[in-house]
């Protein structure tokens, strides 16, 4: 029996913006409220997550997160409107393709 596999990613002007790993990062930031907590949840280094976000923003040409520095009042990170849109778009596409792949897999 064969397994059907696929990868989804979003590009802008031929540059990678968001794939499954990036969607997991944005989702974790959304739920955890900080890059540090998100990186711990995902088992990734803070530096890796930070660099990934910076590359995503550079390739997109706009911010996907708003960072509030730590200090006495804490700090945190939230998704921008564009970050929310990208995450929602990725999840819709990934889910739709997953449904098609599941149906095709049942036909074997």
Regions found by a protein language model. Give the residues of each.
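Short, Lys/Arg-enriched N-terminal segment that forms or immediately precedes the first helix
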Residues: 2-14
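Residues within the DNA-recognition helix of helix-turn-helix
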Residues: 52
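Residue cluster at the C-terminal edge of the helix-turn-helix DNA-binding motif
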Residues: 58-63
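Basic, amphipathic "hinge/linker" alpha-helix immediately C-terminal to the N-terminal HTH DNA-binding motif
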Residues: 67-90
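Alpha-helical linker/hinge and terminal dimerization helices associated
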Residues: 86-107
């Amino acid at each position: 029996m064969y397994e059907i596999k696929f990868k989804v990613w979003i590009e802008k002007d031929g540059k990678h913006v968001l794939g499954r790993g990036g969607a997991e990062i944005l989702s974790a930031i959304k739920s955890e409220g900080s890059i540090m907590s998100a990186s711990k949840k995902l088992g990734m280094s803070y530096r890796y997550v930070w660099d990934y976000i910076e590359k995503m923003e550079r390739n997109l040409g706009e911010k996907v997160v708003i960072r509030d520095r730590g200090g006495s009042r804490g700090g945190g990170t939230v998704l921008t409107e564009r970050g929310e849109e990208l995450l929602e778009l990725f999840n819709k596409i990934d889910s739709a393709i997953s449904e098609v792949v599941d149906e095709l897999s049942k036909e074997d």
